[in-house]
């Protein structure tokens, strides 16, 4: 970082301009799965006419001017899309982006994205943004762009399973506890104690937009949510799943695989042709379930939480 501050920067980090949206979308399209979050916000800007303050441009010196060479989303999470043609350019670009992030951006709740870029940037900004509360350097990025592979019948004769469907606001009080349980296990803190209003607003928005799925069944004699998942990001023809969850007392009975098949079919038919997700590399049961229904490994992600 010190070297990047002393030398003349070849790249700048500054708010994205409207005239750059088309070029930014083209950069993101080079890897639509990895770029789904920035793409979502760029597409929102196109539809709404409002350019989010979280969108930042990485510009490279080119003659007397500068040209767009990367895109950064800095909202609750930080994601950098930094295509590079060679190692020298990549190192220069990342050094300048790290310096720009430290000097111009607020520290996010997490850094998330393609592992190579995310880990490189984290190594450069750690003295300023650290320490990390949670470090997940190896996450498997997966995607499916075909019909899912249907698995065998679920061991669920006693569960009174209803069909997997999109949640409505009438389901909200049942869905919320499942989402909170998943969030605590995945992120490590209770969103109802820290940022409750924003968390609930976000969940309601997903429900209203038809991006939350659930399944009811019977648990200990009571009707309850037994499976759920949401589309956390949507852009560039990619729907990124988050929060794939099965009721703890029912795990190992095939509900995740059957539920995922239904979610994939519905999503690919009505929302986006490609469905993606990422998962910790040590979560072998989840990876096995995803591969069983047809997800393929397409890359590696990394997450740094603060």
How would you label these PLM feature ranges?
Residues 105-115, 238, 267-278:
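Conserved GNAT acetyl-CoA-binding A-motif
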Residues 63-64, 72-77, 187-188, 194-242, ...:
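Acetyl-CoA-dependent GNAT
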Residues 112-118, 248, 277-287, 304-306:
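Conserved beta-strand-loop-alpha-helix junction that forms the acyl-donor binding cleft
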Residues 89-100, 242-248, 252-269, 287-292:
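Conserved acetyl-CoA-binding loop-helix of GNAT-fold acetyltransferases
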Residues 62-63, 75-160, 304:
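Acyl-donor-binding surface of acyltransferase catalytic domains
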Residues 1-38, 150-192:
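Short amphipathic alpha-helix that is part of the acyltransferase structural core
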Residues 116-135, 257, 281-299:
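Conserved active-site alpha-helix within GNAT-family acetyltransferase domains
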Residues 9, 15-16, 26-32, 40-110, ...:
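Conserved donor-binding loop and adjoining core beta-sheet/short helix segment
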């Amino acid at each position: 970082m010190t070297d990047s501050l002393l030398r003349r920067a070849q790249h700048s980090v500054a708010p994205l301009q409207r005239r750059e949206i088309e070029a930014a979308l083209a950069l993101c399209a080079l890897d639509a799965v990895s770029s789904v979050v920035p793409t979502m916000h760029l597409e929102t800007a196109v539809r709404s006419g409002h350019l989010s303050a979280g969108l930042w441009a990485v510009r490279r010196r080119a003659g007397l001017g500068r040209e767009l060479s990367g895109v950064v989303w800095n909202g609750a999470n930080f994601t950098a899309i930094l295509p590079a043609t060679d190692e020298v350019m990549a190192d220069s670009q990342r050094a300048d982006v790290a310096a720009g992030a430290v000097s111009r951006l607020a520290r996010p709740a997490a850094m998330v994205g393609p592992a190579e870029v995310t880990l490189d940037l984290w190594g450069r900004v750690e003295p300023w943004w650290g320490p990390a509360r949670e470090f997940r350097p190896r996450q498997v990025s997966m995607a499916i762009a075909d019909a899912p592979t249907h698995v065998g019948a679920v061991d669920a004769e006693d569960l009174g399973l209803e069909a997997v469907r999109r949640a409505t606001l009438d389901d909200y009080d049942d869905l919320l506890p499942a989402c909170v349980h998943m969030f605590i296990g995945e992120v490590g803190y209770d969103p109802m104690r820290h940022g409750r209003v924003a968390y609930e607003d976000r969940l309601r928005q997903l429900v209203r937009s038809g991006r939350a799925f659930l399944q009811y069944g019977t648990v200990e004699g009571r009707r309850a949510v037994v499976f759920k998942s949401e589309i956390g990001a949507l852009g560039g023809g990619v729907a990124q799943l988050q929060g794939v969850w099965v009721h703890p007392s029912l795990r190992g009975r095939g509900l995740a695989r059957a539920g995922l098949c239904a979610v994939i079919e519905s999503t690919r038919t009505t929302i986006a042709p490609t469905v993606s997700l990422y998962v910790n590399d040590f979560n072998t049961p989840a990876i096995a379930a995803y591969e069983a229904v047809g997800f393929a490994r397409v890359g590696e992600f990394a997450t740094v939480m603060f």
